[in-house]
């Protein structure tokens, strides 16, 4: 296909191996790559924006292959894409990619994900956007994930990818020859236990570390085909998960399922 202008961001920061692998994969396909990402790790920042301090950027071309323009930004992942689209890029990109994240972004955890938030900024600006993650914090081979992301993005653009639809891609942490298939998935509903670890400092004051472990993954009640697997079950079976996500979180069930509205609250008799 023709060369694309691709904006890449992440939440693991400008030095992350997954980021460099993704940028390299895109450039190898002949695409023009620009990177704008946090200057340090800012995982689990969700869709936070920096409002109480200025954003600062610094060129970081030397961290990437020749020909890739790169900036490290003092803000959040969402800040980075917003700033890139508004100020740093000469032209609107054809594609926004966020990742490759060092760890999964599955189920309702995407609401905490800086990786997904960066991609969502592209979606909100009607740019086809994808979040890419390898579902392990320890896995360090990102080459296949980078190739897969570019394959899927190129095909989706050829097939008239709706720009209002974010694609969330999760790759299982295993060798290429052990990966079974790629298919559409639903978001899981993830439940945690022991979310906080309580400790005591030398002065006797309590403090807390957010910890927690997943104890339950429930299938969502979305309106996709009933045979869609959950994203979590897909990864557990060494399959690639691709989940379509819309920024519109509006309720689509029937009115009869909602709590009744009492107009006497507005106009008491």
UniProtKB/Swiss-Prot annotation:
Keywords: Cytoplasm, Hydrolase, Metal-binding, Nucleotide-binding. It comes from the Bacteria. Its main location: cytoplasm. It is found in: Cytoplasm. One of its GO terms (cellular component) is cytoplasm. One of its GO terms (molecular function) is 3'-nucleotidase activity. The keyword NADP does not apply. Pfam families: SurE. InterPro entries: SurE (IPR030048), SurE-like_Pase/nucleotidase (IPR002828), SurE-like_sf (IPR036523). Its EC number is 3.1.3.5. Binds 1 divalent metal cation per subunit. The keyword Ion transport does not apply. Its cofactor is a divalent metal cation. HAMAP family: SurE. Nucleotidase that shows phosphatase activity on nucleoside 5'-monophosphates. Belongs to the SurE nucleotidase family. This is 5'-nucleotidase SurE. It comes from Prochlorococcus marinus (strain MIT 9312). The lineage of its organism: Bacteria, Bacillati, Cyanobacteriota, Cyanophyceae, Synechococcales.
């Amino acid at each position: 296909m023709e060369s694309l202008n691709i904006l890449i961001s992440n939440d693991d920061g400008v030095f992350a191996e997954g980021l460099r692998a993704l940028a390299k994969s895109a450039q190898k396909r002949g695409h023009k790559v620009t990177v704008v990402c946090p200057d340090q790790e800012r995982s689990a920042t969700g869709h936070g924006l920096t409002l109480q301090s200025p954003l600062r950027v610094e060129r970081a071309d030397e961290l990437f292959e020749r020909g890739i323009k790169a900036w490290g930004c003092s803000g959040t992942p969402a800040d980075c894409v917003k700033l890139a689209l508004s100020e740093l890029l000469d032209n609107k990109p054809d594609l926004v990619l966020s990742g490759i994240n060092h760890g999964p972004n599955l189920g309702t955890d995407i609401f905490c994900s800086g990786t997904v938030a960066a991609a969502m900024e592209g979606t909100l600006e009607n740019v086809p956007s994808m979040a890419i993650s390898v579902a392990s914090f320890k896995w360090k081979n990102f080459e296949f994930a980078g190739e897969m992301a570019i394959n899927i993005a190129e095909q989706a653009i050829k097939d008239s990818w709706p720009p209002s639809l974010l694609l969330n891609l999760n790759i299982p942490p295993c060798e290429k020859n052990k990966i079974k298939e790629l298919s559409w998935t639903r978001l899981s509903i993830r439940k945690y236990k022991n979310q906080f670890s309580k400790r005591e400092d030398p002065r006797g004051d309590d403090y807390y570390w957010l910890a927690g472990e997943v104890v339950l993954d429930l299938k969502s009640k979305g309106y996709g085909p009933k045979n869609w697997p959950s994203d979590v079950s897909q990864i557990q079976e060494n399959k690639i998960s691709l989940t379509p996500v819309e920024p519109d979180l509006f309720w689509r069930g029937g009115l009869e399922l909602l709590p009744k509205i009492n107009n006497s609250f507005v106009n008491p008799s």
